[in-house]
Design a protein with these regions (language model features):
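Positively charged, structured surface patches that bind polyanionic biopolymers
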Residues: 1-95, 99, 103, 115
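Eukaryotic partner-binding/assembly regions in large regulatory complexes
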Residues: 104-109
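Charged, low-complexity alpha-helical linker segments
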Residues: 110-117
Length: 117
């Protein structure tokens, strides 16, 4: 199930990992954009923070961006299949919890309005 939005820390521009990314390479700003696109991809597709290799071009990324994101600790390698966004489970709703919340809301609406879910 997809999320209509993700949580994004307002202090992201000052995050030491983002600063290391931006200050550490001439293409660091582009890699930071890939990081944000990856978060929206994971939220939209309900991947719980997993970015499959085949999705990299869809989030405006290249292998060099993935390498930089891993080097600063924003992503972690997930074998040959892709990457995991570091800290996703701590700050974002899981796909499972989103589904449970949606079902509860449907049942509550049905009870309130007398409709079957």
């Amino acid at each position: 199930m997809s999320l209509p939005w993700i949580r994004l820390d307002t202090a992201l521009p000052d995050n030491p990992k983002i600063l290391a990314l931006v200050d550490g390479h001439k293409d660091g700003r582009a890699s930071a954009f890939v990081y944000i696109c990856a978060m929206t991809y994971a939220g939209r597709h309900g991947t719980d923070g997993f970015i499959p290799r085949e999705a990299l071009p869809r989030i405006n990324g290249r292998m060099s961006d993935a390498t930089r994101l891993c080097a600063v600790g924003l992503w972690k390698e997930a074998g040959t299949f892709g990457w995991e966004i570091n800290g996703w489970a701590e700050y974002q709703a899981s796909d499972e919890s989103t589904q449970r919340r949606t079902e509860r809301a449907k049942k509550a609406a049905a009870a309130r309005w007398g409709n079957k879910p």
